[in-house]
Design a protein with these regions (language model features):
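Conserved, structured core segments of small domains
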Residues: 1-96
């Protein structure tokens, strides 16, 4: 299922991860693990934020993806089902 991964890192945890060099490595490993089709980085509500879109093959993959973010960055992590324009078109057509 196409899924948007939202990762938010507090300023304190992000600063610590930048200083110790772990932030780029955790982000790299996460993007490799999910094989993201797209990833964007911004600030939302004063927190470093990443949005990555990927195919979540099984719900049992969630701990493998989320735990390094929880443990390494004290991040808030959300998995949000999403669709592209073509998938929306297909879904709306099924309504009749």
């Amino acid at each position: 299922m196409r899924t948007m991964l939202k990762v938010q890192i507090s300023a304190e945890a992000g600063n610590r991860a930048i200083k110790d060099g772990s932030l780029p490595e955790i982000i790299r490993k996460t993007l490799e693990a999910v094989q993201a089709e797209a990833a964007y980085f911004t600030a939302v509500d004063g927190k470093r934020t990443m949005f990555a879109v990927f195919d979540l093959k099984a719900s049992s993959d969630i701990p493998r993806i989320a735990e390094p973010l929880f443990m390494g960055l004290n991040a808030a992590v959300e998995f949000i089902p999403c669709m592209n324009a073509e998938e929306l078109k297909t879904g709306l057509a099924a309504l009749g």
